[in-house]
């Protein structure tokens, strides 16, 4: 299964074949690629922290969109790349807060995460923002508020909701999307 389909879809398809040689290899390879893709935002975060000289544990991360997908609307958390990112950041000691257009604060707390009470204030306080689903409300978030602190901030746009050039034009913002990160320093 290509794209961000639920992991169960390719696994159910594979289990429906009785002969091991008849297993749908392509769907299983796609599943592996999807699992690896959910680590990409974390690799960007690590590279960003290294390049700007900020210890990972000192960072405040705002993860926007922990539902599996934003459109059509759902509060389904199964297979959520947003959850993968949030939990991995927490394991690194990063202060993580969550906002989702559909998932309730109670559901966020039940998932072991901290919901934001004021989205605008959370954006201002964040050192990095991870946009992890394509809910239409996510594209109306004012990421330019991130530049209110004196150091460079990271915007990971997992769904291409923002114009890269416009975001990069905001002083102090580093834009990243799957396969791209604003050049900061030579590696």
Segments the model singles out, each with a brief description of its role:
Residues 1-187:
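Structural/interface elements that position substrates and couple domains in central-metabolism enzymes
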